[in-house]
């Protein structure tokens, strides 16, 4: 796909830029607004918004209008805007959501783009983050802004090691919170409970050691009570299983494999919520996702000796 900046269309703020997105042959796909810098009255964080979702009317594709909004530091008079690696990953992430909206090709607007089950919506965004960290891709953008020197290999290796740091703890506390969420939402009767006692019993049930607690305790677990993740907090790590397994299709061939990219586009990005997510995924990948790529990415695939008690 190709991007061409549009200068003759309305913008909600002067900081925003507007781009027409087309196929290689020039066929119109949609319009993308990009709004990268913080300002007064703009909330923090980063997100993708669909101003107009795609639909098909009388056989004609009604193109979407999508935006990516971030809060990257503005360039100064003497230097461009320099991004941290986390900020780069954020952009790749939101760009994945944008592609999901821009490449949608369905009949009904209510099923377009990111209108999919919550535990599937992060696949297009999270898979993009994998490319951001690949040495082949880093060499394209991670350069010294004055000299043009490409990021040193030693620094790339440190970046890779940092990605697995403390993942045992991080994964365990997350899974504990996910299982606590499911325990709360698996109750079949109206009951009054002591939140701390309920949580303690739930953690004992799964065998969580006392030195690790759930990422969110019951008394401030907003995600599952008012944040839209009721019985769905697990979706973050499930999306991790999906995105790492999906990325293997490229990692084991070439990072820019056009055949695999075409399969991903036609069976995931274009289809929105028109079919069961696992049906779409298997059509792309040829099989159900494996957990092994996620374990490798987190450095948790290595077999280790069990801890032994120390006398004394």
Regions found by a protein language model. Give the residues of each.
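Cation-handling catalytic/transport regions enriched in His/Asp/Glu
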Residues: 1-312
């Amino acid at each position: 796909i190709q991007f061409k900046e549009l200068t003759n269309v309305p913008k909600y703020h002067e900081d925003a830029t507007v781009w027409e997105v087309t196929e290689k042959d020039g066929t119109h796909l949609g319009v993308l607004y990009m709004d990268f810098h913080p300002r007064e009255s703009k909330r923090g964080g980063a997100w993708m918004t669909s101003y107009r979702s795609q639909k098909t009317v009388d056989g004609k594709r009604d193109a979407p209008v999508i935006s990516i909004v971030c809060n990257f530091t503005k360039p100064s008079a003497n230097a461009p805007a320099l991004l941290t690696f986390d900020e780069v990953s954020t952009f790749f992430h939101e760009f994945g959501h944008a592609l999901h909206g821009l490449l949608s090709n369905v009949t009904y607007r209510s099923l377009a783009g990111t209108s999919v089950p919550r535990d599937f919506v992060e696949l297009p965004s999270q898979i993009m983050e994998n490319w951001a960290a690949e040495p082949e891709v880093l060499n394209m953008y991670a350069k010294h802004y004055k000299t043009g020197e490409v990021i040193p290999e030693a620094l790339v290796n440190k970046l890779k090691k940092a990605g697995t740091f403390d993942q045992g703890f991080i994964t365990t506390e997350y899974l504990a919170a996910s299982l606590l969420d499911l325990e709360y939402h698996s109750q079949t009767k109206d009951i009054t409970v002591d939140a701390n006692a309920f949580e303690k019993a739930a953690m004992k049930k799964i065998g969580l050691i006392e030195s690790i607690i759930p990422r969110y305790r019951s008394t401030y677990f907003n995600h599952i009570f008012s944040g839209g993740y009721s019985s769905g907090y697990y979706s973050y790590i499930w999306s991790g299983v999906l995105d790492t397994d999906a990325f293997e299709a490229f990692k084991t061939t070439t990072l820019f494999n056009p055949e695999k990219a075409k399969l991903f586009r036609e069976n995931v990005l274009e289809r929105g919520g028109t079919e069961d997510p696992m049906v779409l995924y298997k059509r792309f990948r040829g099989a159900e996702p494996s957990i092994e790529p996620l374990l490798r990415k987190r450095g948790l695939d290595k077999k280790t000796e069990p801890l032994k008690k120390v006398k004394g």
